[in-house]
Amino acid sequence: MIEITLKKPEDFLKVKETLTRMGIANNKDKVLYQSCHILQKKGLYYIVHFKEMLRMDGRQVEMTEEDEVRRDSIAWLLEDWGLIEIVPGQRTFMKDLTNNFRVISFKQKHEWKLVPKYTIGN
């Protein structure tokens, strides 16, 4: 989990929607599997990989270094776009960044099937 801050409270929904368009793509079938979610817990906000969410639910999951790199890369990109700020001190634990995921533009969203790998609240 990467602790973040939002520029404005209403940015929560922007980040949540943007994350639905970031993940692993099957270009042939036009399916995108969402990698990360935004989590609010006790007044704090986090970018969380779906496997971390499953682990918090008590499920046995193996989170790979590739999963961590993807989560970190997504958080950095959201920060570059001005949607979030990564809390100071979090960067020291972040992995080397790579572009190992796909971002579907808002305009292309209707052309793709967007599939969350975790549903918050279920």
UniProtKB/Swiss-Prot annotation:
Keyword Heme appears in the UniProt entry: no
GO MF annotations in UniProt: RNA binding
Any one of the GO BP annotations: regulation of translation
KW Plastid (keyword) present: no
The protein's role, per its UniProt record: Controls the translation of a number of proteins (such as regA itself, rIIB and at least 35 others) by binding to their mRNA.
Organism this protein belongs to: Enterobacteria phage T4
InterPro entries the record matches: Transl_repress_RegA, Transl_repress_RegA_sf
DNA-binding positions: 15-37
Keywords, in A-Z order: Repressor, RNA-binding, Translation regulation
Designated name of the protein: Translation repressor protein
Disulfide bonds: none
